[in-house]
C-alpha cells in the first residue's frame, strides 16, 4: 500500500474506531490528516503524533490526500466525500482500511454484539504479557497505554470486528472470537435475525482452513450456528457442560472475580486458578475467550494468569472514579460504563450490585438511537426497572430523526406503569449533574451508562474530588 498511498485523510477522525487506525498508520510512517467538528482526547493525541486535524468539513481539507477513510457515520453529502469522488480519490470504508492492517500481521478479530472491547483488550494484554508485542486497534482506550491503538513489533494484530454495518466481512483474520449474537443494529439486516446469524457464519468462514473460531456456547444463537461452520472451532462457556474451556468456582470479590479455568484442548487437560481484575460474570466469559486465544497461540499459562490479574481496564467499561464526597457529609461510589443495550445494562447492574452489596443503585441512563429504543423497548422497560433509582435522559439521536413513542418520556411512562420505581426524566443532559447532587445519598452507587454525550458526565462529577485529591495529595 505504501508505495502508492502516502497521505491518508480520515473524515470523522475523532471517533474511537477511526482514531485507532489513524494512530497505527502514523506509526507505520504514513502522513495522516483528518477532520472532526469537535476536539477530543483522540484528536489531541493524534495532533501530538503529527496528524493535521481540521475542525471543519471542507473540500480543501483533502487537497493532497491519496485516500479518504470514512465510517458509517459519515454521509455521502459530506463535502470532503463529494470532493474526493469528484477528484477520483479512493473513498475507503473504515473496515476496509482495518482489513489492510490485518494483511500486515496475523490477524485476531473479536466479534459479537457485546463484550468486544473488553475481550480485545484482554487478548492484547495476554499477548503483551507473553512478550509478543502485539499491534492492536480497540474501540475503547486501554488504560495501560492510554490509547485505542498501538503498533507493536510482534506478528499479531488484535482488532474489534464490527457487525453493526456488516463491515466485519472485509476482515480476513487467522483467528476469530464470537462472544454472542444479539438483536442490535437490525436495520442493517432488514430486521431479519436469521440474516444476522448467517452473516456471522460468513464472517467466520473467512478464516483460512488452518484458522480457528473461538465461540461462546453459553449463547444460544452462537451455539445454533456451529453446525454451519466448516472451520476448526474451540468452545468456551460457564453454563455449558460441553464447553472445551469453562469456568467453575466463580466468586465475586468486590471489583474482582476469582474462578477456576478448565482447559480441555491443545495438550493434556489442566486447570488455572484465575483472579480477574474486572467485576461480573459477563467478564468471566470475556476472560475465558481470551484464555482460549492465548491457549491456541501457545501462550504460557503463567502469562495468561498474570495478565488477567493485573489487567488495567478500559475507559468507560465499568470505569470506577472512587468515592465522590457529598456537599454536606458522606459520599457515593461513581461508575461509568459505555453499555447501551439492555443485555449490557443488566450485566453491568448485576456486577455493580455484587461489587457493592447492600448499597442503593442509582442508574443514570441515556438511550442511544431512537431506532434501538423502538426495537428493544420492552427489554429496556424490564431492565431499567431493576434499578433502585432511575434517571433517564432524553435519547441521544446519533444522527437519527425522532421516532414517535421511542423517546425517553415514553420509556419513563412505561416503566412507571410497571409500578417498581418512579423514573426521573431529564430533558437536557446538562441538568444531569445537578439532579444527581440533589438525589444522591451517602452510600449510593451512581452508575452512569450510555454511548452518547452522557460519556462526559462522570468525569464532570468526579472533577471536584480529583482536584481535592491533587491539592491534599
From Swiss-Prot:
Keywords: ATP-binding, Cell cycle, Cell division, Cell shape, Cell wall biogenesis/degradation, Cytoplasm, Ligase, Nucleotide-binding, Peptidoglycan synthesis. GO terms for biological process: cell division; cell wall organization; peptidoglycan biosynthetic process; regulation of cell shape. It catalyses: UDP-N-acetyl-alpha-D-muramate + L-alanine + ATP = UDP-N-acetyl-alpha-D-muramoyl-L-alanine + ADP + phosphate + H(+). The keyword Cytoplasm applies. Gene3D superfamilies: Mur ligase, C-terminal domain, Mur-like, catalytic domain, NAD(P)-binding Rossmann-like Domain. ATP binds at residues 112-118. Its EC number is 6.3.2.8. GO terms for cellular component: cytoplasm. One of its GO terms (molecular function) is UDP-N-acetylmuramate-L-alanine ligase activity. It is found in: Cytoplasm. Coiled coil: none annotated. It is an enzyme of class 6 (ligase). HAMAP family: MurC. PANTHER family: UDP-N-ACETYLMURAMATE--L-ALANINE LIGASE, UDP-N-ACETYLMURAMATE--L-ALANINE LIGASE-RELATED. Cell wall formation. This is UDP-N-acetylmuramate--L-alanine ligase. It comes from Nitrosomonas europaea (strain ATCC 19718 / CIP 103999 / KCTC 2705 / NBRC 14298). The gene is murC.
Amino acid at each position: 500500500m505504501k508505495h502508492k498511498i502516502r497521505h491518508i485523510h480520515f473524515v470523522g477522525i475523532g471517533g474511537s474506531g477511526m482514531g485507532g487506525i489513524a494512530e497505527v498508520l502514523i506509526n507505520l510512517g504514513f502522513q495522516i490528516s483528518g477532520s472532526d467538528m469537535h476536539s477530543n482526547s483522540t484528536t489531541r493525541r493524534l495532533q501530538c503524533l503529527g496528524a493535521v486535524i481540521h475542525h471543519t468539513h471542507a473540500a480543501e481539507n483533502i487537497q493532497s490526500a491519496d485516500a479518504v477513510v470514512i465510517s458509517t457515520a459519515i454521509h455521502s453529502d459530506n463535502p470532503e466525500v463529494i470532493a474526493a469522488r469528484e477528484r477520483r480519490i479512493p473513498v475507503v470504508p473504515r473496515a476496509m482500511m482495518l482489513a489492510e492492517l490485518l494483511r500486515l500481521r496475523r490477524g485476531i478479530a473479536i466479534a459479537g454484539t457485546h463484550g468486544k472491547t473488553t475481550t480485545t483488550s484482554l487478548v492484547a494484554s495476554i499477548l503483551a504479557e507473553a512478550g509478543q508485542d502485539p499491534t492492536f486497534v480497540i474501540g475503547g482506550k486501554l488504560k495501560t497505554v492510554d490509547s485505542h491503538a498501538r503498533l507493536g513489533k510482534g506478528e499479531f494484530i488484535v482488532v474489534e470486528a464490527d457487525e453493526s454495518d456488516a463491515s466485519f466481512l472485509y476482515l480476513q483474520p487467522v483467528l476469530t472470537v464470537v462472544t454472542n449474537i444479539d438483536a442490535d443494529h437490525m436495520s442493517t439486516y432488514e430486521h431479519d435475525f436469521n440474516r444476522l446469524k448467517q452473516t456471522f457464519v460468513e464472517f467466520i468462514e473467512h478464516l483460512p482452513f488452518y484458522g480457528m473460531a473461538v465461540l461462546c456456547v453459553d449463547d444460544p444463537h452462537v451455539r445454533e450456528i456451529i453446525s454451519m461452520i466448516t472451520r476448526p472451532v474451540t468452545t468456551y462457556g460457564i453454563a455449558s457442560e460441553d464447553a472445551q474451556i469453562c469456568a467453575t468456582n466463580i466468586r465475586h470479590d468486590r471489583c474482582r472475580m476469582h474462578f477456576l479455568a478448565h482447559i480441555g484442548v491443545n495438550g493434556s487437560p489442566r486447570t488455572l486458578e484465575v483472579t480477574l481484575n474486572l467485576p461480573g460474570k459477563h467478564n468471566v466469559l470475556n476472560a475465558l475467550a481470551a484464555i482460549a486465544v492465548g491457549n491456541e497461540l501457545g501462550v504460557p499459562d503463567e502469562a495468561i494468569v498474570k495478565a488477567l490479574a493485573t489487567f488495567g481496564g478500559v475507559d468507560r467499561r465499568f470505569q470506577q472514579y472512587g468515592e465522590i464526597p457529598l456537599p454536606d457529609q458522606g459520599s457515593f461510589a461513581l461508575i461509568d460504563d459505555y453499555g447501551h443495550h439492555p443485555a449490557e445494562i443488566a450485566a453491568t447492574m448485576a456486577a455493580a450490585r455484587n461489587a457493592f452489596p447492600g448499597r442503593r443503585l442509582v442508574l443514570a441512563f441515556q438511550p442511544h438511537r431512537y431506532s434501538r429504543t423502538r426495537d428493544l423497548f420492552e427489554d429496556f422497560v424490564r431492565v431499567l426497572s431493576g434499578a433502585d433509582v432511575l434517571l433517564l435522559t432524553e435519547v441521544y439521536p446519533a444522527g437519527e430523526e425522532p421516532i414517535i413513542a421511542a423517546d425517553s418520556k415514553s420509556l419513563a411512562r412505561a416503566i412507571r406503569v410497571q409500578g417498581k420505581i418512579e423514573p426521573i426524566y431529564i430533558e437536557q443532559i446538562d441538568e444531569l449533574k445537578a439532579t444527581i447532587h440533589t438525589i444522591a445519598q451517602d452510600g449510593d452507587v451512581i452508575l452512569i451508562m450510555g454511548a452518547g454525550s452522557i460519556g462526559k458526565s462522570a468525569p464532570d462529577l468526579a472533577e471536584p474530588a480529583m482536584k481535592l485529591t491533587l491539592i491534599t495529595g
